[in-house]
């Protein structure tokens, strides 16, 4: 009975972006087989990954698929799925946001890029993120120009003031 329910979970999980690319790896099928072999570990397999909040470019999707392939290969060799929930969590909290940022920020993104929705595997053309969102602590070119001009102006003013003080000092000295 639980195998039937487990099959439904894998059909839903098959739409996650981890399973969108590189069909030769057959990740969803391998994951289903691995979990069906480990009947006692039903709890670890039952947790379906939720990647609906993410969209990745093709290169990032291939990286995630390759990484998942390697993780599943280790689990198949060890015949253990206990680390599967922590892998899904790490992927969702660490790698997918990192890959999304890489795909939408310079230098990888120039103007627009095609991202694939992680819940539907459908590609959509999207605009790149603004530089301030990609690099929140950095300044854009206009702000850098203003900063440089301000510093230049301050040094110029200090130079003129220094010249005036020195000139008055020399006039006072020659007048004595």
UniProtKB/Swiss-Prot annotation:
PTM section of the record: N-glycosylated.
InterPro entries to which the protein is assigned, alphabetical: TMEM95 (IPR027984)
Transmembrane regions listed in the UniProt entry: 146-166
Coiled-coil ranges (or none): none
Range of residues in the leader sequence: 1-16
Cysteine pairs bridged by disulfides in the record: 17-118, 20-121, 105-128, 109-134
Distribution of this protein across tissues and organs: Spermatozoa (at protein level).
GO biological process: fusion of sperm to egg plasma membrane involved in single fertilization
One Pfam family in the UniProt entry: TMEM95
UniProt topological domain (Cytoplasmic) ranges: 167-176
GO CC entries: acrosomal membrane; sperm plasma membrane
Repeat is among the record's keywords: no
UniProt keyword list: Cytoplasmic vesicle, Disulfide bond, Fertilization, Membrane, Signal, Transmembrane, Transmembrane helix
Extracellular-side segments: 17-145
Subcellular location: Cytoplasmic vesicle, Secretory vesicle, Acrosome membrane
Its membrane topology: Single-pass type I membrane protein
Family, similarity comment: Belongs to the TMEM95 family.
Function: Sperm protein required for fusion of sperm with the egg membrane during fertilization.
Assembly notes: Does not interact with sperm-egg fusion proteins IZUMO1 or IZUMO1R/JUNO.
Protein name: Sperm-egg fusion protein TMEM95
Species of origin: Homo sapiens (Human)
Gene this protein is translated from: TMEM95
